[in-house]
């Protein structure tokens, strides 16, 4: 009985603490038309302290979404265009000799920002990708002999263009796994596109985005997200989903046995649990339900399941495999 009361109290507390989510959504909605999934993905990544890999053709408001979020959170934003000639020093910074001081001084790179847009990450060679991914993992960078912490909150939004593969350097599986979420951005609906065109033709310019929350508030909100209740049955459900990617036959998914080259790692289980918690929080609920897990499952697992040559030959996608798993794993 006491647990029920505690859950009720927790739910009321989360409802109070998550009021800013709707305010943030409304503020971003002034500029971003539609793309609710993209906005939710950004919020989940921000609240879970995870990074996001976005896949979508150019012109779908990826840059606009993260710059708008940065303005609404009153945070520092930086955009890095990845090119074949980019060097790690262009990203993290370097030591510059100062004739005035007769000593080397640190010039910090664009990675020192709260929100970093890594545009077309697969356009740069492995050493540059590694520099970014190390910064993402450690949340600090080394320049010369000194290590410098990155500002908090720190969110990397990396983009890949699915159409142009010529002259690209695909991210290795181990490095892709560092991204908590991989979201696919789709085209807007007809009415949404009409609204976008009207907004850009009105001559009034883009609406002003106001600061509605501070970076410190985001860090406090992360602590609150950790208090969102997750029942043991939900934990088991998450573990079952991940194990179904490794041992599909145990879940009556024999047909997937020859289609999956490798499944999700323990990092996938952690990411799925954290993302489900954050999803419950942005839905202003103090406890996780199976629908929260299912809502974030595709984004968490999309880049963590390797396909065999057989699956690729049959044009089977990870989307279909994840859907099959969700349809077969018993929901608590």
Predicted regions: what they are:
Residues 46-83:
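Walker A/P-loop
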Residues 105-114, 143-160, 171-180:
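AAA+/SF3 P-loop NTPase mechanochemical coupling elements
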Residues 89, 110-137, 151, 166-175, ...:
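Conserved AAA+/SF3 P-loop NTPase catalytic/coupling segment centered on the Walker-B
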Residues 86-115:
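Short glycine-rich substrate-engagement loop in P-loop NTPases that contacts/grips substrate
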Residues 13-18, 31, 169, 182-255, ...:
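Conserved C-terminal "switch" segment of AAA+ ATPases
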Residues 1-9, 14-15, 248-332:
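C-terminal engagement/docking regions of AAA+ P-loop ATPases
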Residues 14-60, 243:
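Pre-Walker A (pre-P-loop) alpha-helix and adjacent loop at the N terminus of AAA/AAA+ ATPase modules
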Residues 57, 91, 159:
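P-loop (Walker A) phosphate-binding loop of NTP-binding proteins
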């Amino acid at each position: 009985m006491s647990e029920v009361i505690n859950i009720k109290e927790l739910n009321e507390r989360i409802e109070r603490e998550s009021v800013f989510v709707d305010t943030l959504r409304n503020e971003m909605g002034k500029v971003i038309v539609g793309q609710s999934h993209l906005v939710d993905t950004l919020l989940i990544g921000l609240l879970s302290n995870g990074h996001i890999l976005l896949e979508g053709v150019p012109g779908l408001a990826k840059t606009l979404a993260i710059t708008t979020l940065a303005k609404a959170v009153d945070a520092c934003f930086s955009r890095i265009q990845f090119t074949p000639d980019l060097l790690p020093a262009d990203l993290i910074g370097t030591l510059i000799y100062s004739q005035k001081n007769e000593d080397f001084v640190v010039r910090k790179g664009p990675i020192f920002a709260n929100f970093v847009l890594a545009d077309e990450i697969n356009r740069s060679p492995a050493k540059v990708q590694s520099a970014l991914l190390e910064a993402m993992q450690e949340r600090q960078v080394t320049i010369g002999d000194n290590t410098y912490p990155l500002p908090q909150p720190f969110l990397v939004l990396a983009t890949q263009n699915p159409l142009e593969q010529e002259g690209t350097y695909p991210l290795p599986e181990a490095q892709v796994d560092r991204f908590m979420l991989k979201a696919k951005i789709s085209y807007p609906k007809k009415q949404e596109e009409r609204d976008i065109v009207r907004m850009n033709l009105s001559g009034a310019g883009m609406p002003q985005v106001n600061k509605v929350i501070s970076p410190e508030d985001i860090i406090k909100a992360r602590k609150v997200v950790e208090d969102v209740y997750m029942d043991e049955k939900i934990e088991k459900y998450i573990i079952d989903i991940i194990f179904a990617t490794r041992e599909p036959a145990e879940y009556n998914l024999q047909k997937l046995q020859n289609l999956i080259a490798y499944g999700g790692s323990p990092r996938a289980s952690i990411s799925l649990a954290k993302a489900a918690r954050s999803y419950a929080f942005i839905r202003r609920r103090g406890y996780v339900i199976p629908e929260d897990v299912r809502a974030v499952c595709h984004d968490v697992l999309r880049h963590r399941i390797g396909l065999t040559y057989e699956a690729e030959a049959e044009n089977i996608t990870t989307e279909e495999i994840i859907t099959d798993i969700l349809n077969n794993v018993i929901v608590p």
